[in-house]
From Swiss-Prot:
Name of the top EC class for this enzyme: hydrolase
Keywords: Calcium, Carbohydrate metabolism, Chloride, Disulfide bond, Glycosidase, Hydrolase, Metal-binding, Pyrrolidone carboxylic acid, Secreted
Main location, first listed in the record: secreted
Binding residues annotated for chloride, in chain numbering: 195, 298, 337
Catalysed reaction, written as an equation: Endohydrolysis of (1->4)-alpha-D-glucosidic linkages in polysaccharides containing three or more (1->4)-alpha-linked D-glucose units
GO MF annotation, one: alpha-amylase activity
Residues bearing PTM Pyrrolidone carboxylic acid: 1
Name assigned to this protein: Pancreatic alpha-amylase
Family, as annotated: Belongs to the glycosyl hydrolase 13 family.
Annotated GO CC locations: extracellular region
Highest taxon, organism lineage: Eukaryota
The EC number(s) this enzyme carries: 3.2.1.1
Length: 497
């Protein structure tokens, strides 16, 4: 369950946030497979509440009504088609699984759900599952409001309502079996694993109990006895009784300190500088590398939700963001996830984005817009498609090329110019200082001419970007202007001319 089940030589996944299943299937075939992406995290595929105030926010998908595969992203047939087509080209599907709760306590009653299932939040009735009042934690929560009031009390974080969301009684075998039944339906279709949403709000023992009920993966695409890859959303920035390590027995965890700290360093806040990244990873107090799912930003914290605060870098900060993602994909720590977002009309009032609720690009009837592809391979319809940015795509390939090679040949200038290699396979150099960089560095690479995969790439026998000459002694000269479009250079043995 720590093994991501990606095909050999594929080392990253991408979160295609709020994409339709039909568009993901196409993207697997036309882009993700040819460029070496290992898999896709998809938005919750099960039926959710339709929220109209505000109008169709992204977070309505984190308010389940049933476990029918029926959302704005598509129906069960479209989901099955996506899983089959992506698996057939070697790209895995990881499902965002919402297990801690159902819809909000104030969601009302009726059939305002993505498949028309009736529910009554007031009396805890979800007949389409079915769940009833006995299946929720109302009687177990010990706060006056029924909500989480104090994160210093681990019991209420697990047993009370997270922002009003009806908390499932996961100590009940019926609830565990129901949750596992939904996940097994997805496993049998062919998914490779799950992100466990709000894992911090579930007891580790309850998670283990439903994970133990899961099937092995579908042998049409996975070797016999393969187990689903599990990564648990545990926001642990320190200072609370609930820690990531309490969840290691259930497989990997999301390391939220990673993006929060990397953002602070690349922004040069609080006296931080890139030279301090020499012992990046466990040396910064992160979870062990083989337990970590890492990312620069995610769908929550790119809009100020969740964890990390203002230091988080996103596509809105494109120049610094590309450097951060480049650093992540070059560094051996953790299993890497790339973000792929949609644009929304950000509007800050008193430091808060009042439009942080905006859902995906949609048509007048509320249906999600298709992902169109422009002639230059960027995306239209307000889909950002960071995973298609040349610098990010080429670093996904870099990580595949250097897989298994050690972190090596670190260099820094005691400030914000740093470099490191991955054994004899790759080397990357950053200039995040406010002055020109001109330095000769030992790369560890075989002699020859290499094509920088940030400013361009190798196309046939020519290079569309900067060329780097590695001499017989393994050294190369690197010149990076602080005004460069992208002030970093990356070379690897797959881009040798």
């Amino acid at each position: 369950q720590y093994n991501p089940n990606t095909q050999p030589g594929r080392t990253s996944i991408v979160h295609l946030f709020e994409w339709r299943w039909a568009d993901i299937a196409l993207e697997c075939e036309r882009y993700l497979a040819p460029y070496g992406f290992g898999g896709v995290q998809v938005s919750p595929p099960n039926e959710n509440v339709i929220i109209t105030n505000p109008y169709r926010p992204w977070w309505e998908r984190y308010q389940p009504v049933s476990y029918k595969l029926c959302t704005r992203s598509g129906n069960e047939n479209e989901f099955r088609d996506m899983v089959t087509r992506c698996n057939n080209v070697g790209v895995r599907i990881y499902v965002d699984a919402v297990k801690n709760h159902m819809c909000g306590s104030g969601a009302g009653s009726g059939t305002h759900s993505t498949c028309g299932a009736y529910f009554n939040a007031g009396n805890r009735d979800s007949p389409a599952v079915p769940y009833s009042g006995w299946d929720f934690n109302d009687g177990k929560c010990r706060t006056g409001s029924g909500e989480i009031e104090n994160y210093g009390d681990a019991s209420q974080v697990r047993d009370c309502r997270l922002v009003g969301l009806l908390d499932l009684a996961l100590e009940k075998d019926y609830v565990r079996s129901t949750v596992a039944g939904y996940m097994n339906h997805l496993i049998d279709i062919g998914v490779a694993g799950f992100r466990l949403d709000a894992a911090k709000h579930m007891w580790p023992g309850d998670i283990k109990a439903f994970l133990d009920k899961l099937h092995n993966l579908n042998t049409n695409w996975f070797s016999s006895g393969s187990r689903p890859f599990i990564y648990q959303e545990v926001i642990d920035l320190g200072g609370e009784p609930i820690t990531s390590s309490q969840y290691f027995g259930n497989h990997r965890v999301t390391e939220f300190k990673y993006g929060a700290k990397l953002g602070t360093v690349i922004r040069k806040w609080n006296g931080e500088k890139m030279a301090y990244l020499k012992n990046w990873g466990e040396g910064w107090g992160f979870v062990p590398s083989d337990r970590a799912l890492v990312f620069v930003d995610n769908h929550d914290n790119q809009r100020g939700h969740g964890a990390g605060g203002a230091s988080i870098l996103t596509f809105w900060d494109a120049r610094l963001y590309k450097m951060a993602v480049g650093f992540m994909l070059a560094h051996p720590y953790g299993f890497t996830r790339v973000m792929s977002s949609f644009r929304w009309p950000r509007h800050f009032e008193n430091g808060k984005d009042v439009n942080d609720w905006y859902g995906p690009p949609s048509n007048s009837d509320g249906s999600t817009k298709e992902v169109t592809i422009n002639a230059d391979s960027t995306c239209g319809n307000d889909w950002v498609c960071e995973h298609r940015w040349r610098q990010i795509r080429n670093m996904v390939i870099f990580r595949n090329v250097v897989d298994g090679e050690p972190f090596s040949n670190w260099w820094d200038n005691n400030s914000n110019q740093v470099a490191f290699g991955r054994g004899s396979k790759g080397f990357i150099v950053f200039n995040n200082d406010d002055w020109h960089m001109n330095v000769d560095l030992y790369t560890g690479l075989p002699a020859g001419t290499y094509c920088d995969v940030i400013s361009g790439q190798k196309e046939g026998s020519r290079c569309t970007g900067i060329q780097v000459y590695v001499s017989g002694n393994g050294k190369a000269n690197f010149q990076i202007s602080n005004n460069a479009e992208d002030p970093f250079i990356a070379i690897h043995v797959g881009a040798k001319l």
